[in-house]
Amino acid sequence: MVDEATKKTLAAIPLLKTKAGPRDGKDWVDRLKEEYTSLIKYVSNNKEADNDWFRLESNKEGTRWFGKCWYIHNLLKYEFDVEFDIPITYPTTAPEIALPELDGKTAKMYRGGKICMTDHFKPLWGRNVPRFGIAHAMALGLGPWLAVEIPDLIEKGLIKHKDKSESSR
């Protein structure tokens, strides 16, 4: 089900070891260190491959994540806010990644702009607890979702490039 390029990307993202969620005190701090290490490596790999497509940061507790993601289509950059909370049952439960400004624009999205990752991503996540983390959610969840949905939304006219929408006023 996973293509060779995705397998290569995944192999380069460090796996996590600590099975801890936000209520697990010191273990959660250890898990957060692993999460940051994994994310930094994934972003670094993306930059080296000229495939840089998101920035994330978290609140002090590491329970709320936010940032930007972008998708290049026909040489135009489409940028979106991205956000998610770490579930109390994390890492058993994957985070639900949201792109709030796209809420209601596609059937592959839940209320609040949460992207649909049920069919393909969640079973894979479940088989890889606690080894998968936020970087894996981005690589296997948001990345493929953007690649499928954004061109379709642009084609249907539901998303307009910011420069084009400003010049048409």
From Swiss-Prot:
Record key words, sorted: Ubl conjugation pathway
Gene3D superfamilies, sorted: Ubiquitin Conjugating Enzyme
InterPro entries xref list: UBQ-conjugating_enzyme/RWD (IPR016135), Ufc1 (IPR014806)
Pfam families membership: UFC1
Catalytic residues in the record: C116 (glycyl thioester intermediate)
GO biological process: protein ufmylation; response to endoplasmic reticulum stress; reticulophagy
Listed GO MF terms: UFM1 conjugating enzyme activity; UFM1 transferase activity
Residue stretches spanning the membrane: none
S-S pairs: none
Function: E2-like enzyme which forms an intermediate with UFM1 via a thioester linkage.
The family this protein is said to belong to: Belongs to the ubiquitin-conjugating enzyme family. UFC1 subfamily.
Protein's UniProt name: Ubiquitin-fold modifier-conjugating enzyme 1
Organism of provenance: Nematostella vectensis (Starlet sea anemone)
